[in-house]
Amino acid sequence: VKLKDFMWNGWLRLGIATKPAAAWNPVGGFSDAFGRMLWLAVGDPALLPAPHGGNWIPNRVSVNPKPVAVAVAIPKDAVRPEPGTGLLRPVGGGRIAQQQFRYSVRLSAFHHGIHTGVADIIYPYIFAFRWGIQGPGASGALDPSVARSTALVREWLAGFKVIRVEEQVMNYGADLKFSYRTPVVDVYLNHRLSDPWERSRTDQRPRSLNPNPRSNDPWEEASIAPPWSTLPWEVIVLMEEAVRRGIAAFSDGEARRRGVPWLDLVRDKETGKRLAVLAESLRLEAYRPDALKGLV
């Protein structure tokens, strides 16, 4: 791993005891020791585990929790993805949430030079509801592994609303000045970790991204459904379309069941050729998923 832009600039050599075995895709791959280490090195999560203690620190998002002792009303123009399709539907009037967070999301450029946009940071919500559950109008695509990994988001997310996009300047003195576009997003949750109902649960499902959460720490709840994506929405859509068309499957189990390759975006040359053809086809038709129409 090359460490650049740090005061200890140099090379860090990492090793593991076993050979890489899992496919390289961030949805249902990177599931072995090498893959997890690789994704930790190149991924850029919304929040990072604090090096001391069991809570979280900001990375791509900062969070301003709205302290409420009782339930909070969700604005009627907030949206929530429709189960099975991912289409963004207005929550409507009279809906209640147990918790509200206001996220400021620091955008920057992806590695190919295109800047992150609002569509990128909300697309994981759409994906979780589109691929994690069957519903009216669904494409019939369901991967049990994806359903399990996105269950917490579907259970907790009551709605979200993009409030505005701000310009943020980080001034480090001299000529070190960085400017960022910063969407402000309100996210509403169905539960709170301090609920007696949550404390009494026996299903052993992880309550947040932290395996040992502190129920009184607002950052735990903030880690459940932050508006952020490490990938451009176009890459996620390319993977979705590849899976939907039978080119590959997100997870190893589903690949075995369907008799198709486990989706590997980097090392599988044959799948790479088919993905390139598919990407060009989607580009020529200016394809956009229905859930993003109006945003891109």
Annotate the PLM regions.
Residues 1-296:
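The feature preferentially marks the first beta-strand/turn patch immediately downstream
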